[in-house]
Amino acid sequence: MNHNVLITGGAGFIGSHVVRLFVTNYPQYQIYNLDVLSYAGSLDNLTDLKNNENYTFIKGDICDNEFIKNIFKKYKISRVIHLAAESHVDRSIVDPFSFAQTNVMGTLNLLQVAKEYWQNNYVNKLFYHISTDEVYGSLGQDGLFSVNSKYDPHSPYAASKASSDHFVRSYKDTYDLPIIISNCSNNFGPNQFTEKLIPLVVNNIIHNKPIPVYGNGENIRDWIFVDDHVRAIDLIFHKGETGETYNIGGSNEMRNIDLINELITTTDSLLGRPEGTSIKLLKYVTDRPGHDFRYAIDSSKLNNQLGWKSSDNFIENIEKTVSWYIKQ
């Protein structure tokens, strides 16, 4: 079946990998990449696709109602994969209004335009909303976030994504819009903007700059390689059940300080430096306000229903990622 797929945020980190997979693997689809090209988005991530016949880039803002209406009408959009978002927690603490505008109002605008354009003819239509595990709040030493976990966001970023999730579900319950939501753990891999933990650490090691460690470095995150996340998005898009939520986790729990030490070891090695050279760059700083202690995802629903599983080669994927940043 042919689809005209609108992918929002397709010039960003995860979005660029999603766009590449869909353009490459589904030549029968027309892929429309909508991105405002903020500081974190770059068409350099997709230069190899610019001449593909089934790929079109559109520069624009998801909050612009008339603009989005024109896109749906001009390109006859039948499916949406919505990744466009402000996503950096520290920035959300400084400027929560921008996060509410993009993540909440932008999502609401897309939902409303999709509802109006599809006019209750929902056959083969889908609004697939990509979200985060941060909406669930924080875990203690034990347990996992499941699709039934209650929402308990602690940062303005998490609150904005939680609100957008609720709006997506409300359009299913109120208007019967065919929606799917997935919530994923922390991603890493090529193309990630350098404000995020892994590329920040690697770049600071490369340039001999201080490596900031929040608090005591004991906070725990569940890391997933971006290719694994994109494989899950592909499966959910094609085989997921509308109205459902799927959690996507990498099953790679690690304390921040342990991850940073691994990045130091790997980066120093790939740069030809003596082991432990960059340990001296560690700098413990005041903890982030509302810093969640631990995230960990239960992906069993996705595993059991759609046959997905994360890769087992975490260290190899870390090495791939570090190598990519060294070459930039």
Task: Pin down the residues of each PLM region.
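Active-site loop immediately N-terminal to the catalytic Tyr-X3-Lys motif
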Residues: 96, 152, 194-195, 240
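Residues at alpha-helix boundaries and the short loops/turns that link adjacent helices
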Residues: 40, 65, 74, 86, ...
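Short, well-ordered secondary-structure micro-motifs
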Residues: 44, 140, 192, 224, ...
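N-terminal Rossmann-like NAD(P)+-binding domain of SDR-like oxidoreductases, especially those catalyzing
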Residues: 1-187, 227, 256, 320-323
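C-terminal substrate-binding subdomain of Rossmann-fold SDR/epimerase-dehydratase oxidoreductases
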Residues: 18, 31, 60, 109, ...
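Proline-centered turn/helix-capping motifs that create local helix->coil transitions or kinks
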Residues: 119-120, 128, 137-141, 176, ...
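Short acidic-hydrophobic sequence patches enriched in Asp/Glu that either
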Residues: 38, 193, 197, 255
